[in-house]
């Protein structure tokens, strides 16, 4: 926990929430338990989820690249933060002797290599720039369920759990939505201070506009993803239903805010 910063959104509470969603998926989905029978695979999943945003600075990759930060230079403008999270993860694990613990086991070196490969692949895939590529392969896996290796399952479970806020209770989902927009605003202020271009949605956004952004994210990213995952893992349908309910609540939320805006405008 000490290696997570006090960012509005990308903090230890986020990592813990993602880990809980992933653990819930593993516990409830029979097909997932079959695909991830090996203890090293399950251990890799839990370590990847809890570490996937470790030491996150509270801004996105675009900020790192635009500001030509040390991390952007180090990782050649490519999945900057995800590469950084991988690096910090293994620095911390090695510092605490996990590699030595592996070395004491039978075939420990091979197990460590497998663990490292699975965790790195999964964390790097949390870069949303890779989402369309992951979605395409997910649709292929629906047609051919044997396509995914155990390592692939770790990658897809982490990415799914990372997109899981709106499958939680409505009040919890709203709290996370509020946090991400606070983080956007914080980044926008830093960009202004550095004289960088600022995305309008990050600086000033009404509640109605925020609702429209979230509704679009649900329609074009979350629903297609979770519905596809539920085709592979039917036990996820309850979370898909919660997601659909959240979408309906956002529709009501938008109508109420638009109505208030109309009344306020008429009053002017």
Regions picked out by a protein language model, each given a short descriptive name:
Residues 11-15:
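Peri-catalytic and regulatory segments of divalent metal-dependent proteins
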Residues 1-5:
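Short glycine/proline-rich turn/loop motifs
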Residues 9-10, 24-39, 47-268:
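Divalent metal-dependent phosphate-bond-processing catalytic cores, especially two-metal-ion Mg2+/Mn2+ enzymes
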């Amino acid at each position: 926990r000490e290696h997570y910063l006090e960012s509005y959104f990308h903090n230890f509470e986020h990592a813990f929430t993602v880990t809980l969603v992933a653990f819930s998926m593993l516990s409830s989905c029979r097909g997932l338990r079959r695909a991830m029978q090996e203890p090293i695979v399950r251990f890799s999943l839990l370590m990847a989820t809890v570490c996937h945003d470790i030491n996150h600075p509270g801004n996105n990759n675009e900020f790192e690249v635009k500001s030509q930060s040390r991390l952007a230079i180090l990782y050649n403008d490519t999945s900057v933060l995800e590469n950084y999270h991988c690096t910090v993860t293994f620095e911390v694990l090695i510092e605490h002797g996990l590699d030595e613990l592996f070395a004491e086991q039978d075939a420990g070196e091979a197990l460590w290599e497998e663990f490292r490969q699975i965790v790195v692949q999964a964390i790097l895939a949390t870069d949303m720039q890779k989402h369309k590529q992951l979605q395409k392969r997910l649709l292929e896996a629906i047609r051919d369920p044997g396509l995914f290796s155990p390592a692939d399952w770790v990658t897809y479970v982490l990415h799914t759990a990372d997109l899981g806020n709106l499958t939680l209770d409505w009040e919890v989902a709203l709290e996370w939505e509020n946090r991400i927009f606070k983080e956007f605003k914080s980044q926008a202020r830093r960009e202004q201070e550095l004289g960088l271009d600022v995305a309008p949605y990050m600086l000033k956004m009404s509640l109605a506009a925020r609702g429209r952004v979230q509704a679009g994210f649900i329609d074009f990213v979350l629903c297609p993803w979770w519905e596809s995952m539920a085709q592979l893992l039917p036990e996820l349908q309850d979370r898909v239903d919660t997601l659909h309910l959240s979408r309906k609540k956002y529709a009501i939320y938008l109508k109420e805010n638009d109505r208030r805006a109309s009344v306020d405008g008429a009053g002017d």
